[in-house]
A protein has these predicted regions:
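Acidic, Gly/Ser/Thr-rich repeat motifs that build Ca2+-stabilized beta-propeller blades
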Residues: 34-206, 259-263, 267, 342-390, ...
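Short, flexible loop segments at the rims of nucleotide/cofactor-binding pockets, characterized by
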Residues: 43, 172, 238, 397-399
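Conserved blade-ending motifs and adjacent loop-strand segments that build the rim/top face
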Residues: 392-415
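Beta-propeller domain segments
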Residues: 94-105, 109-111, 119-121, 191, ...
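Gram-negative bacterial Sec-dependent N-terminal signal peptides
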Residues: 2-31
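Short, cationic motifs built from Arg/Lys/His that form the positively charged side of catalytic pockets
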Residues: 75, 144, 217-220, 407
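Short hydrophobic/aromatic-rich beta-strand motifs
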Residues: 1-2, 66
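Conserved RecA-like P-loop NTPase ATPase core
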Residues: 186, 249, 411
Length: 436
């Protein structure tokens, strides 16, 4: 039986406001967002409100929207406006027909990514990434469920990935609590049909370059959790590994023409990155101490060094602890964007397509949640990043928002062509070019 929540659905569009103009010049990794006017006028409406830390969204073609809340669970918004709760955390405030007794929320961990099987019409499968204490120590898992025909419930839980590490102990670092650097975005690539799973380093210096620990990786698997046969990791690596050597991948999107995977990743108080992935590639993140000219670091993890308690010049910090360490790993995948050297909480990204987007048709839209710590500008915004045929950045524009700035957690283009944006304050917003 479905459970309708008390949340409010708004179906009316908001007031029209200007977006940003896309004429700012930006070159490769030093691309810097500029504000201005633009030909794309955006309207905003609150699509869903009253949520608790909404984390991700996934749409069906008719507008049915699955969404997760980090400490609540999985729900589905029907085209009628009704919300059915499906899978809840044990301590969720709302009533859920199914409770995952082993699931939990802690720090950055909880119920994170959600993805819909490309063959949903035939198999009714939906996938969720969540922290679980079913094993000891706790891990992150990717779970598959079968959705009822009327979307009132889910059943047939199958854990297709069970061994993504979760940070079990606090460490002596900024933001060093349990559950940190947890990754969690999951997406199907429409080109190859595989599920891509992003994971984080847990503030553990051994994880990024480990061949067998599944943190700091992008996994490429089928719907049963098996490695894609085309994966080409280095010898000795877990065959599910598509790429490795990452810090904390928060977003992944696929180019609308080539289906090339592109990730968004938090930097270590400098240099958020966007990177075009290469099968078997190394992201170049290696925060171990006593290597690359570094000495001892707190708890053996140099990810916030040097001067981890204050805001050292970001370029000095980058020289000491590079996000992509080309000196140690000369063949590492180069980022195509580094946020002008800042770390401001790069999160999810999505490509938008359709003539309604004008010059932004085919652009990559990326949300930044903002940091504002140690002298870093907060930087809450959505950047419009335009790529050339070689997937290099040629222009970056800061979108002038028809809504207040916020912690932009998830960006997804809906089947209607609009942009849907989940923010930590508890809303999902719909942004659309004027007249849609």
């Amino acid at each position: 039986m479905s459970t309708t929540t008390s949340r409010t659905i708004h179906n009316l569009r908001g007031i029209c406001s200007v977006a940003a103009l896309g004429t700012a010049t930006a070159l490769a990794t030093d691309a810097t967002a500029q504000s201005g006017m633009n030909t794309t006028m955006l309207e905003e409406s609150i699509y869903l409100e009253g949520l608790s830390d909404p984390w991700d969204m996934a749409f069906l073609g008719d507008g049915t929207m699955f969404f997760t809340e980090k400490c609540e669970g999985l729900s589905v918004l029907m085209p009628s406006g009704e919300v059915n709760t499906l899978l809840g955390m044990p301590e969720a405030e709302d009533s859920y027909p199914v409770a995952g007794d082993d699931l939990f929320c802690d720090g950055q961990a909880g119920m994170n990514g959600v993805a819909i099987d490309p063959d949903f019409d035939e198999n009714r499968f939906v996938y969720v990434y969540s922290a679980s204490n079913m094993s000891e120590p706790p891990t992150n898992r990717v779970m598959r469920f079968t959705v009822a025909d009327d979307f009132s419930s889910i059943a047939d839980r199958t854990d297709i990935v069970t061994d993504i590490p979760y940070k079990t102990e606090a460490t002596d670092h900024p933001f060093g609590g349990t559950g940190a650097h947890n990754g969690g975005r999951i997406r199907f690539n429409p080109g190859d049909g595989y599920l891509y799973v992003t994971t984080g380093d847990n503030h553990n210096p051994e994880i990024p370059q480990s061949p067998t620990i599944m943190g700091s990786k992008v996994l490429r698997i089928d719907g049963d959790g098996n490695a894609a046969p085309e994966n080409n990791p280095p010898e000795g690596f877990d065959p599910r590994t598509y790429t490795y050597g990452h810090r904390n991948v928060q977003g992944i999107a696929f180019h609308p023409e080539t289906n090339t995977p592109i990730i968004m990743e938090h930097g270590p108080w400098h240099s958020d990155e966007i990177t075009v992935l290469e099968n078997g590639g190394n992201g170049g993140w290696d925060p171990r101490d006593n290597m690359a000219g570094r000495g001892d670091c707190p708890d053996g993890y140099c990810g916030y060094m040097p001067n981890q308690g204050e805001g050292m010049n970001r370029y000095e910090r980058a020289a000491f602890m590079p996000m992509t360490d080309f000196e140690t790993y000369p063949d590492a995948m180069p980022p195509i964007w580094t946020n002008n050297g800042w770390s401001q909480g790069t999160s999810s990204g999505t490509f938008v397509t359709g003539e309604q987007w004008g010059d932004w048709d085919g652009a990559l839209l990326v949300g930044l949640m903002g940091i504002g710590f140690g002298g870093t500008p907060i930087g809450q915004r959505i950047d419009v990043i335009q790529l050339d045929d070689q997937l290099s950045v040629f222009d970056v524009t800061e979108m002038t928002l028809p809504m207040p700035s916020a912690r932009f957690r998830s960006l997804v283009q809906g089947p209607d062509g609009a942009l849907y944006v989940a923010v930590d304050s508890g809303e999902i917003h719909r942004l659309a070019p004027s007249g849609m």
